[in-house]
Design a protein with these regions (language model features):
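Bacterial N-terminal signal peptides
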Residues: 10-22
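N-terminal secretory signal peptides that target proteins for export/translocation
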Residues: 1-6
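N-terminal (or domain-start) structured segment
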Residues: 28-119, 157-158, 167-168, 180-204, ...
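An extracytoplasmic/periplasmic, membrane-proximal ligand-sensing/linker region
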Residues: 34-36, 178, 218, 265-326
Length: 326
């Protein structure tokens, strides 16, 4: 015969199990998103990617009805951020704004990759392009790419270029290779500290994204000589292209939203739709354009195909520049 206390314990346990089941079911059926989303960035605060992402994410959070928490994880050419997101739960609450650095260039720059740029991620939406530009310390007596090349050839090994991303590394190495220059490479963890040393005159030049470098150019702390894209930048129409002097030079930095592999399709569809709505707003396009970003987006499938294409593009760039894996 079961005692009363045992019966009560059994009933309580049964009730607890039923309650837990109901809670679990309710949680599973809760509409996405039901809590804040963490958005991981592979670069430090103050970088071009950070500045443009904060504009987009503020509006995205309003549209989704939750907070978007920006988490900057610079280091190892963006690998720290990419690895963190790749290992996160595919529930839509840990996302990443990536660029060509972690997802296009690193596989050909790093010997020990800690993630697969395709298999470990779910493409959500491309968010645009960020042109890079060549900037130099104002004390360097050159006002064009041709004049800078002449100076560097006159004194081989004297001039250096800083880098805070894979795009900057590849741009500098491509410049040296195509122009036949002996330049010292000085790598940094991210662009802001590299920029600080360039302004202080501790390095000679740098390829930097327009949003990060433009304020310093406008303040006369740096001189801008050219943009890295095939076409001139709408924001800096007076700047020539690198290709105008160094034939074959064409490097663009892209941005896009990704999550861990195997994210539910309905969550990806929702995020993609809201991101694209943000980009359709003229005020947002204007804010991003003022920071040097050409904003546009498309379906997840289009972004997935683009990611694979960019691996081919950056493999060619890196091999052409003669850069070996480190």
């Amino acid at each position: 015969m079961i005692s009363l206390s045992t019966q009560r314990l059994g009933a309580a346990a049964a009730f607890a199990m039923i309650f837990a089941g109901l809670t679990s079911a309710a949680s599973a059926q809760a509409p996405y998103p039901s809590r804040n989303i963490t958005l991981v960035l592979p670069f430090a605060a103050g970088s071009g990617t950070d500045a443009t992402t904060r504009i987009i994410s503020r509006e995205l959070g309003i549209a989704l009805g939750v907070g978007i928490v920006i988490e900057n994880k610079p280091g190892a050419n963006g690998s720290l951020a990419a690895s963190h997101v790749a290992r996160s739960a595919p529930d839509g609450y840990t996302l990443m704004v990536s660029t060509n650095t972690p997802h296009s260039a690193n596989p050909y720059l790093m010997k020990n990759m800690t993630y697969d740029p395709i298999k470990d991620f779910t493409p959500i939406a491309r968010s645009g392009d960020l042109p890079f530009m060549l900037v130099i310390h104002p004390d360097i007596p050159a006002n064009s790419v041709a004049e800078l090349i002449a100076l560097a050839k006159k004194e081989p090994g004297k001039y250096s270029f800083a880098s805070g991303s894979s795009a900057a590394i590849v741009s500098g190495a491509t410049f040296a290779s195509l122009a036949g220059l002996d330049l010292l490479h000085v790598p940094y963890k991210s662009s802001p500290p590299a920029l600080t040393d360039l302004i202080a005159g501790r390095v000679s030049m740098m390829f930097i994204d327009v949003p990060t470098g433009l304020p310093h150019v406008n303040a006369k702390a740096l001189k801008a000589l050219a943009v890295t894209t095939k076409q001139r930048s709408a924001l800096l129409p007076e700047l020539p292209t690198m290709d105008a002097t160094v034939k074959g030079f064409d490097i663009t930095s892209w941005q896009g939203y990704l999550g861990p592999a195997n994210m539910p399709k309905d969550i990806v569809t929702r995020l993609n739709a809201e991101i694209r709505k943000v980009f359709e707003r003229p005020d947002i396009k204007g804010q991003l354009a003022n920071r040097g970003m050409e904003a546009f987006s498309g379906p997840p499938e289009e972004f997935a195909a683009f990611l694979k294409e960019q691996l081919v593009v950056w493999e060619k760039l890196i091999k052409g520049a003669g850069i070996e894996k480190q």
